[in-house]
A protein has these predicted regions:
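N-terminal helix-cap/turn-to-beta initiation motif at the start of protein domains
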Residues: 14-23, 44, 65, 113-115
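Short, solvent-exposed loop/hinge segments that bridge or flank secondary-structure elements
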Residues: 19-53, 82-86
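Edge beta-strand at a domain terminus
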Residues: 58, 102-117
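Short, surface-exposed linear segments at secondary-structure transitions and domain or protein termini
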Residues: 69, 93-100, 114-117
């Protein structure tokens, strides 16, 4: 019985792991091979979001009711600072890219080709 309870506690994280993994363009002409720099791309890999000069661990995923979206506690560090934010992430149904919503900001990123990184 205890093993079953542990399995159910771990299962939601395993189901969501890798759901948004990929490399995404910051702009239409962004270089997909340059991750984390201005003019380059962003990456989500193994529940870590790599942005420009920063990275965030995507923790405590919660599926948003009646939406194909996930809410994360983002534990971020970069440029000699650390902070926490909440962010909602979902796949872009039109382009196959990513939509990321932070408090007051929404971003839409196109996915780079699979062989970009």
């Amino acid at each position: 019985m205890i093993r079953l309870a542990i399995a159910f506690a771990v299962l939601p994280g395993l189901v969501l792991a890798g759901l948004f993994d990929g490399v995404y363009k910051q702009t239409a002409n962004a270089e997909c091979f340059l991750v984390g720099v201005d003019g380059g791309s962003l990456q989500i890999k193994d529940d870590i979001f790599y942005g420009v000069g920063m990275e965030c661990r995507m923790a405590s995923p919660v599926q948003v009711v009646d939406m194909e979206a996930t809410l994360y506690n983002m534990q971020c560090a970069g440029e000699d600072a650390a902070w926490s934010e909440r962010a909602m992430v979902m796949n872009d149904k039109e382009s196959g890219g990513l939509i990321m919503i932070w408090n007051g900001y929404a971003f839409r990123y196109d996915r780079c080709a699979d062989d970009a990184n």
